[in-house]
């Protein structure tokens, strides 16, 4: 377990907007009556940078962000199980470049949808409870990791439908896993966090032969020699409550709990003592009225800024390149009153989407001077 080092005071950002950038509401869509839990732009394929996907109820919907604030629906998938409630969705990719969408939720089954053929490519079965988050390996987008209520994280090959590795056990999470994220440049490493208040860093390096084997496996996926990984390389207790979102920022980590703020901190791993090390909280990004769980933030592709919604339907956009932290702007509209469950920033941050508890999607676009 890492220790939080004292003596280094973290720097808190000011809630006075700098208005470095200004945004205006350009669209609002009422998708349905059910809560929308996820909205994600495609960062994997430059052909589809303007395409985003939403998840809510038993439905997954793809949209295109057009110029002048317009949004067009491209396709919609309704799960055969009407009791399904999707909590998370991620873009992935077939080995031939086909765009896939992977979605999971209360039923614990991950549906991998082939966008080109509009069919289910694979259904990934293995989790014993609901799936709270899916993230794709950007360097190898056939690989996804899933965080589950069953206290495990699983690594899958969406092309072959194989569960490669299961991260759980003696050193694993002790309650629901709420968020996962692959390291942006170290292909072997990812972070997970959850209701047990911890953030864990895991390494797949010594199990990479299993990953390679998953691409050439021709037998039944259920016969694949799935490996259990019981111990992370690092565990941190940065927060004192549920940790529901974590994202890598280079070798640093952005994470949030239910304490009205996002933290930027540095995990300092001890190479000779796996699981141990220290943690320095460097910067704090305040987010008022954000003390309930399952509110997730997002960044643009180049990690220049972060956008997060709150319980009142407002979005706070922080500059990640400034120290002390600078609030770029606060986005609000008199009709946006519902909890914002997730935001999505476009590749360059010029468009910000928010999906809400009341089934609405809001679009803000930067005002060009």
Curated annotation (Swiss-Prot):
SUPFAM superfamilies hit by this protein: WD40 repeat-like (SSF50978)
GO molecular function: DNA-binding transcription factor activity
GO BP term, pick one: chromatin organization
Organism: Arabidopsis thaliana
UniProt-recorded name of the protein: Polycomb group protein FERTILIZATION-INDEPENDENT ENDOSPERM
Pfam families for this protein: WD40 (PF00400)
Keywords carried by this UniProt record: Chromatin regulator, Developmental protein, Nucleus, Repeat, Repressor, Transcription, Transcription regulation, WD repeat
Major subcellular site: nucleus
PANTHER family per record: POLYCOMB PROTEIN
Keyword Transcription assigned: yes
Tissue expression summary: Expressed in cauline leaves, root and stems. In the male reproductive organ, it is expressed in the developing anther; and is abundant in microspore mother cells, in microsporocytes and in the tapetum, but is absent from vascular bundles, the connective tissue and the filament. It is also absent from pollen grains at subsequent developmental stages. In the developing female reproductive organs, it is highly expressed in all cells of the young ovules primordium before archesporial differentiation.
Entry function: Polycomb group (PcG) protein. PcG proteins act by forming multiprotein complexes, which are required to maintain the transcriptionally repressive state of homeotic genes throughout development. PcG proteins are not required to initiate repression, but to maintain it during later stages of development. They probably act via the methylation of histones, rendering chromatin heritably changed in its expressibility. Required to prevent the proliferation of the central cell by repressing unknown target genes before fertilization.
Subunit structure: Interacts directly with MEA. These two proteins are probably indirectly associated with FIS2. In plants, PcG complexes are probably composed of a member of the EZ family (CLF or MEA), FIE, and a member of the VEFS family (FIS2, VRN2 or EMF2). Component of the plant homeodomain / polycomb repressive complex 2 (PHD-PRC2) large complex during prolonged cold, composed of core PRC2 components (VRN2, EZA1, FIE and MSI1), and three related PHD finger proteins (VIL1, VIL2 and VIN3) that mediates histone H3 trimethylation on 'Lys-27' (H3K27me3). Binds to ALP1.
WD repeat residues: 31-73, 81-123, 126-166, 172-212, 238-275, 287-328, 335-368
InterPro entries noted in UniProt: G-protein_beta_WD-40_rep (IPR020472), PcG_WD-repeat (IPR051243), WD40/YVTN_repeat-like_dom_sf (IPR015943), WD40_repeat_CS (IPR019775), WD40_repeat_dom_sf (IPR036322), WD40_rpt (IPR001680)
One GO cellular component term noted in the UniProt record for this chain: chromatin silencing complex
Family recorded in the similarity comment: Belongs to the WD repeat ESC family.
């Amino acid at each position: 377990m890492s220790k939080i080092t004292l003596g280094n005071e973290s720097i808190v950002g000011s809630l006075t907007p700098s208005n470095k950038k200004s945004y205006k509401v350009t669209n609002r869509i009422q998708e349905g009556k059910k809560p929308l839990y996820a909205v994600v732009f495609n960062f994997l394929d430059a052909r589809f940078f303007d395409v985003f996907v939403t998840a809510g109820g038993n439905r997954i919907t793809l949209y295109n962000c057009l110029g002048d604030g317009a949004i067009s629906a491209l396709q919609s998938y309704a799960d055969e199980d009407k009791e399904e409630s999707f909590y998370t969705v991620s873009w992935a990719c077939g080995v031939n470049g086909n765009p896939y969408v992977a979605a999971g939720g209360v039923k614990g089954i991950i549906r991998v949808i082939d966008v080109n053929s509009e069919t289910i490519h694979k259904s990934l079965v293995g989790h014993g409870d609901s799936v709270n988050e899916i993230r794709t390996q950007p360097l190898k987008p056939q690989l996804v990791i899933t965080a589950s209520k069953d206290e495990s994280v699983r690594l899958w090959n969406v092309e072959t439908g194989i569960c490669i590795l299961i991260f759980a056990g003696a050193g694993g999470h002790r309650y629901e896993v709420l968020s996962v994220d692959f390291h942006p440049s170290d292909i072997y490493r990812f972070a997970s966090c959850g209701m047990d208040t911890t953030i864990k860093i895991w390494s797949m390096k010594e199990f990479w032969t299993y990953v390679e084997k998953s691409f050439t496996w021709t037998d039944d996926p259920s016969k694949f020699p799935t490996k259990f990984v019981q111990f992370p390389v690092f565990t941190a207790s940065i927060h004192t409550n549920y940790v529901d979102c974590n994202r890598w920022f280079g070798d640093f980590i952005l994470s949030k709990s239910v304490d009205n703020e996002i933290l930027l901190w540095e995990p300092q791993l001890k190479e000779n003592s796996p699981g141990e090390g220290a943690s320095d909280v460097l910067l704090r990004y305040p987010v008022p009225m954000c003390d309930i769980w399952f509110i997730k933030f997002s960044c643009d592709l180049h990690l220049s800024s972060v956008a997060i919604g709150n319980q009142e339907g407002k979005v706070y956009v922080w500059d990640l390149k400034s120290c002390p932290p600078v609030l770029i702007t606060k986005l609000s509209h008199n009709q946006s009153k519902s909890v914002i469950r997730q935001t999505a920033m476009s590749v360059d941050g010029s468009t910000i989407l928010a999906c809400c508890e009341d089934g609405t999607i809001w679009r803000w676009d930067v005002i060009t001077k």
